[in-house]
């Protein structure tokens, strides 16, 4: 049985090095791996000994914490209906009637959409308080940066198509978008911002060289969106440090997307994650491979901020954006009826709330211990995310 356990854990640890896939699970035996310090010798006393003091029971560790999520499995967390203008139904421009000015409930194209890619990279300092070489209370303080990519339907990219309103009348028309642009891609990059996490880990059961342990962690960060890219044939644009409207319904202010816009705030994403895990390790001299299971719940909330396409405050050559014509029939004719009918107008998107699509995952890794004072852990996580983790620490 021991040989089988050794084989399974060693295979898992070696596999992690060749298949690097938010919060790490960590080695369940970590609280008891480093029993000596670089400044003070370890003390393996009995908690029931009346002569033992808390100074003998407590030790500190510090080190580097690196966590690299290459693909977090996420989906949107939105309502089934979305408020916007009614979809156009006329066959040609000549049949256009009044432009939509009232919102109606339509099926939300963002409902249940899966994100194509979600990445997050964190570098931090690691600090742990150890009790009786069995329990760890730890925290990390550092910086994180992220990247998100998904179908434009996940971001409710919408615009107005087939308008009868002339460019000179847009300021007072109060028109709402009527077309969902679902065949495009939206991606965003965040800045590097402060991130922190706290957690606890305990070695619950030991039998020879095997250790069964559990951990609980919480992490938080709030990066701002550094760059937003919309890759859409009908309306393609890039915004550096985008700003938008929180809690605003259509129609947006006519100045939305211009330098004169007011009432906007920076687009930022509030990241939260909870995680609980259970893992089993087996020590083989310097190496301690482990395998674990975890349950986690993550959310990315941007307050459903609505961001408008950049445009000019006043028309130049009767245009305010560089959106192309849809059918190739558009002409620039000043004050002509239907002059803007063939181009996409008042385009905007919103950053919807996202959450984990899968809650359970597995982790495999190994820890290398030197002189009972230093340790380096390498880990990979699969199923609910593809991620790699590196931790290097020493005991005082």
Swiss-Prot record:
<dbReference type="GO" id="GO:0006811">
    <property type="term" value="P:monoatomic ion transport"/>
</dbReference>
<dbReference type="Pfam" id="PF01308">
    <property type="entry name" value="Chlam_OMP"/>
</dbReference>
<keyword id="KW-0812">Transmembrane</keyword>
<feature type="signal peptide">
    <location>
        <begin position="1"/>
        <end position="22"/>
    </location>
</feature>
<keyword id="KW-1134">Transmembrane beta strand</keyword>
<comment type="function">
    <text>Permits diffusion of specific solutes through the outer membrane.</text>
</comment>
<keyword id="KW-0732">Signal</keyword>
<comment type="subunit">
    <text>Part of a disulfide cross-linked outer membrane complex (COMC) composed of the major outer membrane porin (MOMP), the small cysteine-rich protein (OmcA) and the large cysteine-rich periplasmic protein (OmcB).</text>
</comment>
<keyword id="KW-0406">Ion transport</keyword>
<comment type="similarity">
    <text>Belongs to the chlamydial porin (CP) (TC 1.B.2) family.</text>
</comment>
<comment type="function">
    <text>In elementary bodies (EBs, the infectious stage, which is able to survive outside the host cell) provides the structural integrity of the outer envelope through disulfide cross-links with the small cysteine-rich protein and the large cysteine-rich periplasmic protein. It has been described in publications as the Sarkosyl-insoluble COMC (Chlamydia outer membrane complex), and serves as the functional equivalent of peptidoglycan.</text>
</comment>
<dbReference type="GO" id="GO:0015288">
    <property type="term" value="F:porin activity"/>
</dbReference>
<dbReference type="GO" id="GO:0046930">
    <property type="term" value="C:pore complex"/>
</dbReference>
<keyword id="KW-0998">Cell outer membrane</keyword>
<dbReference type="GO" id="GO:0005198">
    <property type="term" value="F:structural molecule activity"/>
</dbReference>
<keyword id="KW-0626">Porin</keyword>
<dbReference type="InterPro" id="IPR000604">
    <property type="entry name" value="Major_OMP_Chlamydia"/>
</dbReference>
<keyword id="KW-0813">Transport</keyword>
<dbReference type="GO" id="GO:0008360">
    <property type="term" value="P:regulation of cell shape"/>
</dbReference>
<dbReference type="GO" id="GO:0009279">
    <property type="term" value="C:cell outer membrane"/>
</dbReference>
<keyword id="KW-0133">Cell shape</keyword>
<protein>
    <recommendedName>
        <fullName>Major outer membrane porin, serovar A</fullName>
    </recommendedName>
</protein>
<keyword id="KW-0472">Membrane</keyword>
<keyword id="KW-1015">Disulfide bond</keyword>
């Amino acid at each position: 049985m021991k040989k089988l356990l050794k084989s399974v854990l060693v295979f898992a640890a070696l596999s992690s090095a060749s298949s690097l896939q938010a919060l790490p699970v960590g080695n369940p035996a970590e609280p008891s791996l480093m029993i000596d310090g670089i400044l003070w010798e370890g003390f393996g006393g009995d908690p029931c000994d009346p002569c033992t003091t808390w100074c003998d029971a407590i030790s500190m560790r510090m080190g580097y914490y690196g966590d690299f999520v290459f693909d977090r499995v996420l989906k949107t967390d939105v309502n089934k209906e979305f408020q916007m203008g009614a979809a156009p139904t006329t066959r040609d421009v000549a049949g256009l009637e009044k432009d939509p000015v009232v919102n109606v409930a339509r099926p939300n194209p963002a409902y249940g959409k899966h994100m194509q890619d979600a990445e997050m990279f964190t570098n931090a300092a690691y600090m742990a308080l150890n009790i009786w070489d069995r329990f760890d209370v730890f925290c990390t303080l550092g910086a994180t940066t992220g990247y998100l990519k998904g179908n434009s339907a996940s971001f409710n990219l919408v615009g107005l198509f087939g308008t009868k309103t002339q460019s000179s009348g847009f300021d007072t028309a109060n028109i709402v978008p009527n077309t969902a642009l679902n065949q495009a891609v939206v991606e965003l990059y965040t800045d590097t911002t402060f991130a922190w996490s706290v957690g606890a880990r305990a070695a619950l059961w030991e039998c020879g060289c095997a250790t069964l342990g559990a951990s609980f962690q919480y992490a938080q960060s709030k990066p701002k969106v550094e760059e937003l890219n919309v890759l859409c044939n009908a309306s393609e644009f890039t915004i550096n440090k985008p700003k938008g409207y929180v809690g605003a319904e259509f129609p947006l202010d006519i100045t939305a997307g211009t330098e004169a816009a007011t009432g906007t705030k920076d687009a930022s994403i509030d990241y939260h994650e909870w995680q609980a895990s259970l893992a089993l390790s087996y020590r083989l001299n310097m190496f301690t491979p482990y395998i674990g299971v975890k349950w986690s719940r993550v959310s990315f909330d941007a307050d459903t901020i609505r961001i408008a396409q950049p445009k000019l405050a006043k028309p130049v050559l009767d245009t305010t954006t560089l959106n192309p014509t849809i059918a190739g029939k558009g002409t620039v004719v000043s004050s002509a009826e239907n002059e803007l009918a063939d181009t996409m107008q008042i385009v905007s998107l919103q950053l919807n709330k996202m959450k984990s699509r899968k809650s359970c995952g597995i982790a495999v890794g190994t820890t290398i211990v030197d002189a009972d004072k230093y340790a380096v852990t390498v880990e990979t996580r699969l199923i609910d995310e593809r991620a790699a983790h590196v931790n290097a620490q020493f005991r005082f």
